[in-house]
Curated annotation (Swiss-Prot):
Protein name according to UniProt: Bacterial non-heme ferritin
CDD domains membership: Nonheme_Ferritin
CC terms in the record's Gene Ontology section: cytosol
SUPFAM superfamilies assigned: Ferritin-like
Reaction(s) the record says it catalyses: 4 Fe(2+) + O2 + 6 H2O = 4 iron(III) oxide-hydroxide + 12 H(+)
Gene: ftnA
Keywords in alphabetical order: Iron, Iron storage, Metal-binding, Oxidoreductase
Enzyme class: oxidoreductase
Tree of life domain: Bacteria
Subunit structure: Homooligomer of 24 subunits that assemble into a spherical protein shell (12 +/- 1 nM diameter) that can sequester at least 2000 iron atoms.
GO biological process, one term: iron ion transport
Length: 159
């Protein structure tokens, strides 16, 4: 049985993952509107991945005898700048999510819930990849400049 404290913390993370999903969907819509179909595709995939995290966390709570729930999800921004600015925002957002996941691991450790720690370590590892991927895209966009932005757009469309 999962503790109420840990259940509540993971439920908060479920809402955060759903907000992240909406954030990436908003970015996808923006890129579609701006004619960057590859960036839009990448963001849609990212949105689906974040929603998958929310489902996985909800399933985990239920398997542990807890109650999964979705709290209010705040509205996400809709106005974005250049592709570089958007991906810099993505990188900062992923760093924020990493801190949230790290805090969950700390709560699981304090609750002496090894099963939940094990479950959450998968997300810790994934966040390392998410940050590296976002930083890599930022770096590519900076190196490519305006002339290479459509090449990067086409690359990300192959995700």
């Amino acid at each position: 049985m999962i503790s109420e404290k840990l259940q509540n913390a993971i439920n908060e993370q479920i809402s955060a993952e759903m907000w992240s999903s909406n954030l990436y969907l908003s970015m996808s819509f923006y890129f579609e509107r701006e004619g960057f179909s590859g960036f839009a595709h990448w963001m849609k995939k990212q949105s689906q991945e974040e929603m998958g995290h929310a489902y996985a966390m909800a399933d985990y709570i239920i398997k542990r005898g807890g109650i999964a729930k979705v709290d209010k999800i705040d509205v996400v921004p809709t106005g974005w700048g250049t592709p570089l600015e958007v991906f810099e925002h993505v990188f900062e957002h992923e760093r924020h999510v990493s801190k949230l996941v790290d805090a969950l691991v700390d709560i699981a450790a304090a609750e002496k819930d090894k099963a939940t720690q094990d479950f959450l370590w998968g997300f810790v590892r994934e966040q390392v990849e998410e940050e590296a991927t976002a930083q890599g895209i930022v770096d590519k966009i900076k190196r490519a400049g305006d002339a290479g932005i459509f090449f990067i757009d086409s690359q990300l469309g192959q995700r």
